[in-house]
Amino acid sequence: MCRKDAYAPFREHVTALSAKATAPLTATGRLWGERTLDTSGGLPDIAIVDWKAPFRWLAGGWRDLWKAPVPCLTYGLLLAIVSFGIAFALIASDAEFWALALTCGFVFVAPMIAMGLYQAGRSIERGEKPTLGEMLFVRDALRGDLAYLGLFLLLIYLLWGRIAQIVYGLSTYQLHRTVDDFVTFALTTSDGNTMLVTGTLAGGLIAFLTYCGVVVAAPMLLDRNTGVFTAIATSVRAVAENFWPMLLWAAILGVLTLASAATGFIALIVVFPWLGLASWRAYRDLVPGPLQE
């Protein structure tokens, strides 16, 4: 009498997963070719995009901005006013270093601040006119999973502030109270150069890891009734499957955001809504599917 193999179903499942994991992927499909799909069980499909995709997202975001200029630019104006007020308060308190550090760390919390712009992008895609009220008070933003993502980004932001403080404290025993003094120290002394390199590398690494987890997750949680871990996993997969286009997109977001802050936050009035709407386009391109109600 033959003995039944209790592990046969498990082995068959593992064999099927292994065959799927080792299926060939072409470089053409990843970087230069037409838009294709990569599927994984239990997670949404991920589209493979080419290196030109970030520029298409920017162009689409710019068009969307001028389909609803009043609410979108007002949203950007409110952000610029709040950002300027915080920076002014820190500078007036002789904490200019913190103003610089927190401005650089703005990229960590930007995905949650842009939630109203994702809502505007969704409305525009549906053929509706977004209003400032629905952008400021996004109904779906009250969901627990979005709150968890916001808490995660806030903790990352605070972690960045602590790391910046440690790097600065280990680099000098003096307190540079003005921006001019700090810039002079950073650019003209060996300790300042070391601080600049160390802080840039540490901040860049944290920023990129955070970007991988939230670039798709934030708009996805607004659009779909899914869990925060599923959204983060989908975001990481989107970056992994489109590494070079997404690296370019990260550079565009970072450079334009920080350059806007360098104008005294004035450029944020236009740039932030533009990038927020473009980010919605990026999500819809990377995670295709019908809009959720």
Tell what function each PLM region has:
Residues 1-293:
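Hydrophobic alpha-helical membrane segments
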